[in-house]
Regions:
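A sequence-level/structural motif corresponding to short, flexible coil/turn segments enriched
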Residues: 1-169
Length: 169
């Protein structure tokens, strides 16, 4: 099947859900993706946004489609489904208004060219469960992620920030 809008889409990750649906994610320059009723972000915010969508197991019906991003550029690089069917995402953004949530590691853009982001959407694409920047004064890019169950989320990427947030261990 085909999926997309008037410009270009880049597919970065896809997984089958526990019930056989196909969940996929990437980034787009199209402002007319077929977002669905109840989508977390039904409208394109500009300059390249992430997207997350799902098809039924036969690929014949779009279950949901939502954008994810701010007014700048978002490159969504990886996606995993957690044990509850929620959608965990990583990538990079240069948006100063990327959607973040209370209580996360970093609610404010760190500076430089771009920051890494990690976000979690509900399994139906209707709610942002959390969103955070991870970055310092340089460029910071999230490429891959692994879910570690109760231990958290492991994100790999690249940085040239000398003040990138690190842990002691």
């Amino acid at each position: 099947t085909f999926f997309g809008g008037v410009d270009r889409e880049t597919l970065m990750a896809a997984e089958r859900s526990a019930n056989g649906d196909i969940v996929f994610a990437g980034y787009t320059w199209s402002d007319d993706l077929p977002t669905t009723a109840g989508a977390y972000q039904p409208r394109y915010r500009g300059n390249g946004d992430g997207y997350v969508a799902a098809l039924d197991g036969s690929g014949s019906r779009l279950l949901f489609c939502t954008y994810l991003g701010g007014s700048g550029i978002e490159n969504l690089h990886d996606m995993k489904l957690d044990n509850e069917g929620n959608i965990v995402l990583s990538g990079l953004t240069d948006s100063r208004d990327f959607p973040t949530t209370p209580g996360v590691l970093q609610r404010v853009y760190g500076g430089g060219d771009d920051d890494m982001f990690v976000a979690k959407l509900s399994g139906d694409g209707s709610r942002l469960l959390f969103g955070t920047y991870i970055g310092g004064a340089g460029w910071d890019e999230g490429y891959n992620l692994q879910l570690l169950g109760a231990r958290g989320i492991l994100v790999s990427g690249a940085t040239n920030s000398d003040n990138f947030p690190v842990t002691a261990d």
